[in-house]
Amino acid sequence: MSKVLIFGHKNPDTDTICSAIAYAELKKELGMDAEPVRLGEINGETEYALKKFNAEVPRLVNTVANETDSVILVDHNERQQSVDDLDQVRVLEVIDHHRIANFETSDPLYYRAEPVGCTATILNKLYKENGVEIKKDIAGLMLSAIISDSLLFKSPTCTEEDVKAAKELAAIAGVDADSYGLDMLKAGADLSAKTIPQLLSLDAKEFTMGSHKVEIAQVNTVDTNDVLSRKEEVDAELAKAVSEKGLDLFVFVVTDILTNDSVVVASGQAAQAVEKAFNVTLADNTATLKGVVSRKKQIVPPLTEALKG
């Protein structure tokens, strides 16, 4: 077997990058020739975590079939979120914590999906199940992933298992989860140097909801006005993306990590679905969603329901 490439979704976040690294490390310990790679540029939060725990940025790839015949997916399963030539390779494994959609394989595979807040929480179990000790820096990366996905344990996606795993990993890494976590989240929330096109692609995922093609992008900030003061440009870029990608709906979610509220900006012919999904009224294509921070648990399910049929 050729080298196995391990990667998460396009527009990678901290869980996608850190879990690819951590799982590749486990697989190598178990005798597999594995390499973590990425499908896009890393964000400021992820960069902070990698530097803190002495990890190299995984290699960027646009295709995989040109160098391997086997891959492992972490932190995603939906085809449109994965590498473009996924159908040309064999998917050996999937380790994920999201809904299963638009995914099928020609061969049997190992599929581990759990309703937890982060892929790294599952990896913590896999290390234990395989009797492999987690190295200090790898533990730090896995902790970073959990902090990121759970917004420092405040997200409704966060489970007791995530909190328990984070405590274990923080002890191994030798850091205080709360103080380190806040520093890491703040590093990711500094959006001042980012252009609007960059903000729309930092953490964007495409979904099929009923017969609709939907993209949801999310950024975290300590002040939503950092983004919304550029609303005119946001509207223009959203409309451009809708046209170029053939989207029915593009939802841009700006999340305040201090108040745990989000502001959404909607564009596309199906924009009214946002009103139905969240029982809000769009004013200038914009609405505030109180207490909403999780795309996976609080945005995707009601929007999917609103776009049925």
UniProtKB/Swiss-Prot annotation:
Compartment(s) where it occurs, according to its Swiss-Prot or TrEMBL record: Cytoplasm
Record-listed E.C. numbers: 3.6.1.1
GO molecular function (one): inorganic diphosphate phosphatase activity
Keywords, comma-separated and alphabetical: Cytoplasm, Hydrolase, Manganese, Metal-binding
InterPro entries: DDH_dom (IPR001667), DHH_sf (IPR038763), DHHA2 (IPR004097), DHHA2_dom_sf (IPR038222), Mn-dep_inorganic_PyrPase (IPR022934)
Chemical reaction(s) catalysed: diphosphate + H2O = 2 phosphate + H(+)
Family, as annotated: Belongs to the PPase class C family.
NCBIfam families from the UniProt entry: PRK05427.1
Cytoplasm listed as a keyword: yes
GO cellular component: cytoplasm
Matching SMART domains: DHHA2 (SM01131)
Cofactor requirements of the protein: Mn(2+)
Annotated positions binding Mn(2+) 1: H9, D13, D75
Cofactor binding mode and count: Binds 2 manganese ions per subunit.
Entry keyword Cytoplasm: yes
Annotated protein name in UniProt: Probable manganese-dependent inorganic pyrophosphatase
Binding site for Mn(2+) 2: D15, D75, H97, D149
